[in-house]
């Protein structure tokens, strides 16, 4: 779920003719032998080209190009601009913002060939290609006795998550993913290649850490990595609760508002069971430490009337698959119609959570074609908040978010009535949570943004003037 105001508008003032372009004739002579051009009419187009996680308000393409070299990307960017063809670069394909719908008749630059992983354990660094996903780095890092903060969906692109902040269950120990970023190689909108770090193009390095999708295509990135916590082992606990326990669960979540141990993360998943016609609530806890320590933080959950539980020690590569009783596959299914919304909270208001839980049940009962999941990510914000707010362009107050809310709304794509009902419901719910969020203004993890919040919310009023200056 990644925000961009970039590569669909790189000086492209006239887009109406893009659909008539023959992209093969325009680009083929400038590409290396390993590069490929794909058209939507190709038989295997959806297998050969990275597909989006969601089709909701998606961009439209007249074709895709899969570059093999950095020079290929430079040539694609230059030729696309000169021919007034909009484009987007994709890696994991998890961008879900509605702003992408404004990219029409463009080309997809599928950078999936940029998938290398190189670990320098002695110097605690890792260099990756721009298309590498979380699932590509976790096994080799684990084998090397190292770790890096990652998100919980294994198929999400590492770099894409990074430049929007990057949250996950190692955040309490090492901060946001972008706080571990050391440098990148970047193809600029003008087609130049730059090395960007604190010592080279430092202003640009500030900008890409929080607003990177606006400043170019990252072909490689180098990260600081860390010694594996608890020898790479974590406790994973899952609890399935009936609807009647939801208020008690939110009370426990509230008890962690002041202090959440850095080794502990909590995730709640709420959804409607079509069979029982009741809401259900799953809580997952990940603790990077000894089992007995982790269990000591979960006694209040264990005291509730869970209908199913499991608790196990898992190696880091198996953490995500252990969450929510192993139901992590949906996050990696492409081509679904998912209308996502999000919000960040500083505190937990039990009444707001309980009211929404009941309203989501009523909405689900009233709309049989609707299937919504409400996710609450709880990570310690201490390490992220310890980084000075002005050191990166990441939204000014985002580092103080205690709870990241994600609303995943799934329903048939041809139901405009339900589209309107869902959007109206989400606006109301977002406003309710915002009023009791503990923040004076809306705060949101950029990669969870819906796309209607506006630039002040995405980048913060404090950072937006400098970002605009660097963009001009």
Swiss-Prot record:
Signal peptide coordinates: 1-18
Organism superkingdom: Eukaryota
Protein's pathway: Secondary metabolite biosynthesis
InterPro entries in the cross-refs: FAD-bd_PCMH (IPR016166), FAD-bd_PCMH-like_sf (IPR036318), FAD-bd_PCMH_sub2 (IPR016169), FAD-linked_Oxidoreductase (IPR050416), Oxid_FAD_bind_N (IPR006094)
Protein name (record): FAD-linked oxidoreductase azaL
Domain FAD-binding PCMH-type stretches: 54-228
EC number: 1.-.-.-
Gene field: azaL
PROSITE patterns: FAD_PCMH
Glycan-carrying positions: 22, 44, 102, 123, 227, 246, 273, 305, 318, 390, 415
Family to which the UniProt record says this protein belongs: Belongs to the oxygen-dependent FAD-linked oxidoreductase family.
PANTHER family for the chain: BINDING OXIDOREDUCTASE, PUTATIVE (AFU_ORTHOLOGUE AFUA_1G17690)-RELATED, FAD-LINKED OXIDOREDUCTASE AFOF
Keywords, alphabetical: FAD, Flavoprotein, Glycoprotein, Oxidoreductase, Signal
Induction: Expression is under the control of the azaphilone cluster-specific transcription factor azaR.
Organism annotation: Aspergillus niger (strain ATCC 1015 / CBS 113.46 / FGSC A1144 / LSHB Ac4 / NCTC 3858a / NRRL 328 / USDA 3528.7)
Enzyme class per UniProt: oxidoreductase
Function, as annotated: FAD-linked oxidoreductase; part of the gene cluster that mediates the biosynthesis of azaphilones, a class of fungal metabolites characterized by a highly oxygenated pyrano-quinone bicyclic core and exhibiting a broad range of bioactivities. In the first step, the non-reducing polyketide synthase azaA forms the hexaketide precursor from successive condensations of five malonyl-CoA units, presumably with a simple acetyl-CoA starter unit.
Gene Ontology molecular function: FAD binding; oxidoreductase activity
Pfam family, one: FAD_binding_4
